[in-house]
C-alpha cells in the first residue's frame, strides 16, 4: 500500500497521527537530509580553512582573494552535484535546504509532516557538521577570519545583501522548476545547481556571503557566535524561492516531483507524477 496522501482515508484522523505515521515510515529520508547538509558544512569548513586562514600554506600560495573564492566555489559546487546524484540524494531528493522544502510544500508535492521533519533534519544536520568541525579544529575554525564559515552581509550593507539573496534564490529555484517537468531535463538539475553554486560563491558572495539556505547560516552562527544579519538568511532564501514558485504557477508550469533528480529505482515519498516510482509501503 503506498504512503497515504493528505486527502486519503488513512489521514482523516488527527494531525498528530499523520505526523507519527510520517516519522515511522520516512525517517530514512530525514536522516539522509541531516547527513547531507552535515557533510556539506564539513566540506565547506575544510575548504575555507585551507584557502582563507592566514596560517594555511595554500592560502599563502594563492594571494588573490577572488581566485581563492573561485576555487571554493568549484569545490562546493562539485559537492552539491555529488550530493544530488548520490544514491542517498536520489532517495531523499537532496533538498538539504528548508527553503527548497518549503517551496515544494507550497507546490503540493510535500506533505506538511514531511516538510516539518525535513526542515528539522536540515537544521540539525547542518549544526552537527559545524559543531563537529569546531570540536576538531577549535579556534582555527570558530574564530575570525573563518568564523565557522559564517554568512555575513558585504560592504554594501544588509539591504543589498537581502536583495542579492532573494535574487540568487529566485534564479536557482526557477531553474529547478523549469527542469522539473520531465525526467529528460531533470537529470541535468544537479549539474546546473552545482554550476550556479560555484558562480554564486565566486561572484555573489561579496554581497551577502552567499547563503541560499537558512539552515546553513544558522549552522555557522552556532559555533562562531556570529549572528549579524541572520534575519536576511532566514527570510530572503524562502522569499526568493517562493516567488519563483508563484511565477511557475502563474505561467502554468508543471511540477512533477519534489526530488531534484528523480530516479525510479529509489523510492519516492512525495506526490510524484513519474511512472514507476517505488511507493513507500505502510503497515496498517
Please name every model-derived segment:
Residues 1-284:
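Membrane-interface helix-loop junctions and terminal tails of multi-pass membrane proteins
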Amino acid at each position: 500500500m503506498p504512503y497515504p496522501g493528505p486527502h486519503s482515508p488513512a489521514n482523516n484522523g488527527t494531525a498528530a497521527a499523520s505526523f507519527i505515521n510520517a516519522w515511522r515510515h520516512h525517517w530514512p529520508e530525514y536522516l539522509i537530509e541531516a547527513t547531507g547538509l552535515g557533510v556539506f558544512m564539513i566540506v565547506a569548513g575544510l575548504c575555507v580553512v585551507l584557502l582563507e586562514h592566514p596560517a594555511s600554506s595554500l592560502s599563502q600560495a594563492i594571494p588573490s582573494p577572488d581566485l581563492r573564492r573561485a576555487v571554493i566555489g568549484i569545490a562546493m559546487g562539485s559537492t552539491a552535484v555529488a550530493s544530488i546524484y548520490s544514491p542517498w540524494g536520489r532517495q531523499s531528493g537532496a533538498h538539504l535546504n528548508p527553503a527548497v522544502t518549503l517551496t515544494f510544500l507550497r507546490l503540493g508535492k510535500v506533505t506538511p509532516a514531511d516538510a516539518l521533519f525535513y526542515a528539522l533534519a536540515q537544521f540539525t544536520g547542518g549544526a552537527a557538521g559545524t559543531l563537529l568541525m569546531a570540536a576538531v579544529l577549535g579556534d582555527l575554525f570558530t574564530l575570525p577570519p573563518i568564523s565557522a564559515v559564517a554568512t555575513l552581509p558585504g560592504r554594501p550593507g544588509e539591504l543589498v545583501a537581502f536583495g542579492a539573496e532573494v535574487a540568487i534564490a529566485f534564479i536557482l529555484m526557477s531553474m529547478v522548476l523549469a527542469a522539473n517537468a520531465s525526467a529528460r531535463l531533470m537529470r541535468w538539475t544537479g549539474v546546473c545547481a552545482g554550476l550556479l553554486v560555484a558562480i554564486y560563491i565566486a561572484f555573489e558572495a561579496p554581497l551577502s556571503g552567499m547563503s541560499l539556505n537558512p539552515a546553513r547560516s544558522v549552522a555557522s552562527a552556532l559555533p562562531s557566535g556570529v549572528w549579524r544579519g541572520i534575519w536576511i538568511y532566514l527570510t530572503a532564501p524562502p522569499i526568493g524561492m517562493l516567488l519563483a514558485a508563484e511565477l511557475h504557477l502563474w505561467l502554468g508550469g508543471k511540477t512533477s516531483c519534489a526530488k531534484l533528480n528523480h530516479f525510479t529505482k529509489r523510492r519516492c515519498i512525495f506526490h510524484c507524477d513519474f511512472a514507476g516510482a517505488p511507493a513507500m509501503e505502510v503497515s496498517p
